[in-house]
């Protein structure tokens, strides 16, 4: 979640923070808007321990995304390296999203104060 800035900050402080955010904006090529979901499930064998009250099979890790049609399970990530790469890519996306949200809040406050957004 993006940090809410202090609206009592001076316009100069907001512009400095904006310049800093812009200098820190980095779009990682592996950014990924998705979730990594851990699932446990029952198999299709009626006499398996998972149907007799035992532990379910898993964990299985799925990459999921919310699209216009709903939440989609993209695919199963079997290798630990795939799972770690997905976690890192999702974190990169969240970092970018947080910085953009803070930048948007600063711009909204500058507009409210009737200041130009250009030239920062």
Residue ranges with predicted function:
Residues 1-120:
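A positively charged, amphipathic N-terminal helix/segment that binds anionic biomolecules
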């Amino acid at each position: 979640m993006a940090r809410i800035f202090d609206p009592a900050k001076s316009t100069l402080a907001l512009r400095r923070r904006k310049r800093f955010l812009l200098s820190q904006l980095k779009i990682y090529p592996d950014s990924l808007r998705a979730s990594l979901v851990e699932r446990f499930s029952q198999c299709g064998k009626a006499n398996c321990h998972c149907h007799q009250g035992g532990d379910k099979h898993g964990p299985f890790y799925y990459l999921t995304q919310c699209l216009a049609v709903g939440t989609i399970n993209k695919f199963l990530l079997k290798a630990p390296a795939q799972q770690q790469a997905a976690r890192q890519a999702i974190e990169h996306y969240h970092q970018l999203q947080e910085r953009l949200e803070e930048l948007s809040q600063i711009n909204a406050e500058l507009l409210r104060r009737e200041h130009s957004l250009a030239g920062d």
